[in-house]
Amino acid sequence: MSAGDVLTILFTSLMAMVPIVLTSVGAAWSERAGVVSIGYEGVLLISAFFGAIFAELAGSAVVGLIGGVIVGILLGMLHGALTVYLKGDHVIPGIGINLLSLGIVPFGILAYWGTAGQHQLPEDATMWHLATPYGELSPMVLVTIVIAVVTWWVLFKTPLGLRVRAVGENPEAADALGINVERYRFWSTVYGHALAGLGGAFMSVDWLGLVHKTMSGGRGFIALANMVFSGWNPLISLIGGWLFGFFEALAAWLAPKHIIPGQFILMLPYIMTLIIVAGIIGRARPPKWDGRPYKRE
């Protein structure tokens, strides 16, 4: 492996980390407030689909990214309404979003573009990239880093973040201090899903330039693993997300080399996810009220 190959893998890993980091950061904020969602895989897929539609209609990738955020917000409001205000189970709505994506995206691609399973976006609907000898970089890489750092700073260094963490650790005490637990939990859920929506739209209108019925590729679940690996810390999620992106980039580099069987190469990012998660089981410390509905008495 030459120095150029190493740089190619590193550049690819920066692109691959974006949807994982954005989703991990959003999930960490939401769970710090006490709301669990396992529906980020579906959010990524649905927002990738609708982001592509918005981008094509407007002829602008930026509009597509905004469209993905809007889709994430709507799905987050749905999840928040069911879990925060209706006191429903936190897992079931996420499963519903994942199942919805498996139906709506393949059908939508066929109905809207008339193609089976995949559609290539025109050039004017995709984001420009900075070209280098070792690969291309999107401005979304920098945006993702800024979002992770700012989210960490707000969560751990500001009164707003203190209140968010309070409703996830001890909502009864927070309520007694006059903090509106339901409001903070609801909007934290919306923020988490909005970031996942941005990550989904990034995949279609920026990174890959296409829509595919399975393009999320398990990244929503990998992002949740990264969130746990990072200890619900958005800043560490940035490092963990790059690590997962590195293994995905390494798999992409190895695939045409035929050094090891292709099936194993495709499994590599998921094998590393299992190894990392297995290594932290029993040591992870989620917020005390994570996933528990709060009912004011």
Annotated model-derived regions:
Residues A16, T23-S24, A48-A52, L102-P106, ...:
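Hydrophobic core segments of alpha-helical transmembrane domains in multi-pass membrane transport
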Residues W29-S47, V84-I97, R163, W187, ...:
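Short, non-helical or kinked segments that cap or interrupt transmembrane helices
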Residues T8-L10, L155, G192-A225, P256-P261:
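Inter-helical junctions in multi-pass inner-membrane proteins, predominant
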